[in-house]
């Protein structure tokens, strides 16, 4: 079969993807437009995340600069309430810094190691954040509903142990998921494509994502509903031993935590479910690819992200 681009004065790296798109007489201009669109998409995809990472790094660093000095001066009773908050802030700051560095490194190389590190940091920060939200909600529940148990049985050392367990669990999960995610996008120690492990790993990833989202949502919702029922029950029986201001503050903090986690869920769910569905994009037929190329006005309007092998 003749190369439809052989007479073009300029040769684009995207030509191999459109060799079978023969239903056109303007192939040279079309492939140049494709390259322009891909270049714009690439730089937008690079600049916007980098800008957000820089802003997030600044905000997390500022937050830590205020929180850490206060935390060191707290007594043991107060520290129990802030251990997961400090852990969450450190995890977020570390993730922002490393992911910003990895974004820049992706311009230089696309090796399996780079992809693995990128997904490892992303997954580690994600799972540790989920664990910190669950831990904070449980401590808030115990401090409000079971204050005696919270004071006598839950020590600072106990909370530290839970925080370390959360970190270890996050590392194990992150290493497992990052390895398969990186193998989907780059050649690694083992082959993972449509003919081998990808269908199974995509299903495993889907289950892990759904479970990871479900556990914190159920925990936060349960604690929030329990606190609301506890407030109504105390008022109905005339029990005013509980400090109303403390109870109201607990419900407000939990509601904002649930709202914040919902935003995090949305930002993590979109790319995660996109990754789970990559096999669908890889199965696009030639006529669909060519249809996008032929419809260059619509192509320029919406763009089309081609996965490069």
From Swiss-Prot:
How does the record classify its membrane topology?
Multi-pass membrane protein
MF-aspect GO terms: G protein-coupled receptor activity
Q: Which UniProt keywords apply?
A: Cell membrane, G-protein coupled receptor, Membrane, Receptor, Transducer, Transmembrane, Transmembrane helix
Q: Which residues cross the membrane?
A: 39-59, 82-102, 114-134, 162-182, 204-224, 256-276
SUPFAM superfamilies, alphabetically?
Family A G protein-coupled receptor-like
User: Where found, per UniProt?
Assistant: Cell membrane
Which coarse location class describes where this protein primarily resides?
A: membrane
Q: Which domain of life is it from?
A: Eukaryota
According to the UniProt record, one GO cellular component term is: plasma membrane
Q: Does the keyword Transcription apply?
A: no
* The keyword Transmembrane helix appears for this protein: yes
Which residue positions does the secretion signal occupy? none
The UniProt entry's sequence similarity note says: Belongs to the G-protein coupled receptor 1 family. B0244 subfamily.
Q: What is this protein called?
A: Putative G-protein coupled receptor B0244.4
């Amino acid at each position: 079969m003749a190369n439809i681009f052989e007479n073009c004065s300029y040769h684009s790296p995207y030509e191999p993807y459109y060799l079978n798109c023969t239903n056109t007489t303007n192939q040279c201009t079309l492939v140049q437009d494709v390259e322009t669109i891909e270049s714009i998409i690439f730089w937008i995809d690079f600049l916007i995340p980098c800008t957000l990472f820089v802003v997030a790094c600044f905000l997390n660093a500022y937050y830590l600069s205020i929180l850490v000095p206060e935390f060191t001066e707290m007594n043991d009773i107060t520290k129990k309430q802030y251990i997961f908050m400090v852990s969450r802030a450190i995890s977020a700051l570390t993730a922002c810094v490393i992911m910003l560095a990895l974004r820049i490194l992706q311009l230089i190389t696309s090796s399996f190691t780079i992809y693995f590190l990128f997904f490892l940091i992303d997954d580690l920060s994600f799972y540790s954040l989920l664990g910190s939200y669950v831990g904070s909600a449980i401590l808030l529940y115990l401090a409000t509903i079971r204050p005696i148990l919270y004071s006598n049985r839950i020590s600072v050392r106990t909370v530290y142990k839970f925080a370390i367990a959360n970190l270890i669990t996050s590392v194990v999960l992150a290493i497992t998921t990052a390895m398969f995610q990186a193998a989907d996008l780059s050649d690694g120690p083992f082959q993972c494509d449509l003919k081998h492990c990808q269908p199974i790993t995509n299903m495993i990833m889907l289950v892990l994502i759904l479970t990871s989202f479900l556990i914190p949502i159920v925990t936060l919702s349960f604690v929030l509903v329990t606190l609301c029922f506890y407030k109504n029950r105390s008022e109905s029986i005339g029990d005013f031993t509980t400090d109303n201001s403390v109870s109201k503050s607990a419900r407000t903090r939990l509601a904002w935590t649930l709202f914040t986690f919902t935003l995090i869920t949305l930002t993590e769910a979109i790319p995660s479910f996109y990754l789970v569905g990559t096999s669908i994009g890889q199965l696009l037929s030639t006529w669909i690819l060519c249809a996008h190329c032929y419809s260059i006005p619509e192509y320029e309007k919406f763009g089309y992200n081609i996965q490069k092998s």
